[in-house]
């Protein structure tokens, strides 16, 4: 009887735990640009120093995603964490599968990120460009 009780607890708690993980990971990617860094909040979030940016561009497509290295990929297009794109590990912070995507390259990492709408993504890109002062 004891083992049936434990199995029932597992069967009940597993969907609840999975639901919590999906809820937490599917929250909107909050991204802010401060004076000297870009902050991506949430699960697999990161801080990117503006001074470390070597390349910055707005891309319509991203390379093919070969596999998840350390991250989460949800059915609604959200992707967060490290992914293998072509032959390199890249950090993705994607709200959806539609471009444009902001591409950022530093000495240590490469990133692709986008926001819920084209307008918000372009606005974030403009903010980063302004902070970086690519003149």
Which residues are covered by each model-predicted region?
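Solvent-exposed, well-ordered amphipathic alpha-helical segments
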Residues: 1-5, 9-12, 47, 54, ...
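Terminal and domain-flanking low-complexity segments
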Residues: 62, 96-135
């Amino acid at each position: 009887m004891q083992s049936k009780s434990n199995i029932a607890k597992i069967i009940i708690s597993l969907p609840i735990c999975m639901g919590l993980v999906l809820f937490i990971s599917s929250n909107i990617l909050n991204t802010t640009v401060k004076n000297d860094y870009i902050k991506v909040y949430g699960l697999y979030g990161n801080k990117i120093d503006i001074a470390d940016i070597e390349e910055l561009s707005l891309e319509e497509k991203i390379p093919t995603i070969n596999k998840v290295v350390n991250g989460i990929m949800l059915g609604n297009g959200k992707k967060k964490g490290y992914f293998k794109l072509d032959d390199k590990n890249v950090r993705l912070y994607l709200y959806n599968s539609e471009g444009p995507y902001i591409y950022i390259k530093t000495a240590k990492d490469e990133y692709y990120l986008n926001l819920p709408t084209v307008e918000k993504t372009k606005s974030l890109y403009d903010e980063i460009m302004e902070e970086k002062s690519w003149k």
